[in-house]
């Protein structure tokens, strides 16, 4: 839970990625009170939900990340999230979306496909998520997306739920050093 993470990592940023679609203020407030530093709201939510999450972010001092997953126009979705007050954009190609498109024999989409356009469309920090290799994720800052996410698919084997070496901390340190250019 968020509160357990906050207790064990008192100085670390914690993103509560609930992908909020409704009940925006309530969900964001619950996560803020538990110790989250950032919450995530979806662009496909009603704009009133986005506004409620943004207001909660202001009231409780947490950052609001707007996620454009599933938007028919990803660039416009990012723009709308910024216009509604989100301080960060998560440019996101979903797991099911990628897998389904690939299973149908088509090229799997990547957040890199429209990353340049999303970055140019907004003035807030952008993070690219979904189907990236470690090398692509590490390179995101050079594409104008300074926030790097290392989710489970990038850091562990999906079948064994372990890193190749079995040492998650060492793997994460190596990746962070690459992102920060201190390898």
Model regions and ranges:
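Catalytic cores of alpha/beta
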Residues: 23-34, 72-84, 121-124, 128, ...
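Catalytic beta/alpha-barrel core
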Residues: 13-21, 37-48, 63-71, 87-95, ...
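Glycine-rich phosphate-binding active-site loops on the catalytic face of alpha/beta enzymes
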Residues: 36-48, 89-101, 143-171
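Short secondary-structure transition/capping segments
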Residues: 1, 26-29, 51-54, 77-80, ...
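Long, contiguous secondary-structure blocks with strong helical propensity
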Residues: 78-91, 121, 135-137, 170-183
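Conserved active-site and cofactor/substrate-binding residues in soluble primary-metabolism enzymes
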Residues: 26, 48, 76, 110-113, ...
């Amino acid at each position: 839970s968020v509160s357990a993470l906050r207790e064990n990592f008192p100085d670390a940023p914690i993103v509560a990625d609930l992908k909020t679609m409704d009940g925006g203020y309530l969900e964001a407030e619950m996560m803020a009170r538990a110790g989250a530093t950032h919450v995530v709201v979806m662009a496909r939510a009603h704009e009133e939900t986005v506004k409620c999450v943004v207001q909660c972010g202001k009231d409780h001092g947490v950052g609001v990340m707007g996620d454009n997953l599933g938007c028919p126009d990803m660039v416009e979705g990012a723009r709308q999230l910024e216009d509604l007050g989100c301080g960060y954009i998560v440019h996101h190609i979903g797991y099911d979306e990628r897998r389904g498109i690939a299973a149908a024999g088509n090229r799997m989409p990547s957040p890199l496909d429209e990353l340049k356009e999303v970055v140019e469309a907004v003035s807030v920090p952008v993070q690219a998520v979904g189907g990236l290799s470690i090398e692509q994720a590490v390179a995101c800052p050079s594409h104008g997306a300074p926030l790097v996410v290392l989710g489970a698919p990038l850091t562990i084997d999906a079948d064994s739920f372990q890193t190749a070496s079995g040492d998650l901390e060492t793997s994460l340190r190596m990746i962070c050093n690459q992102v920060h250019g201190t390898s």
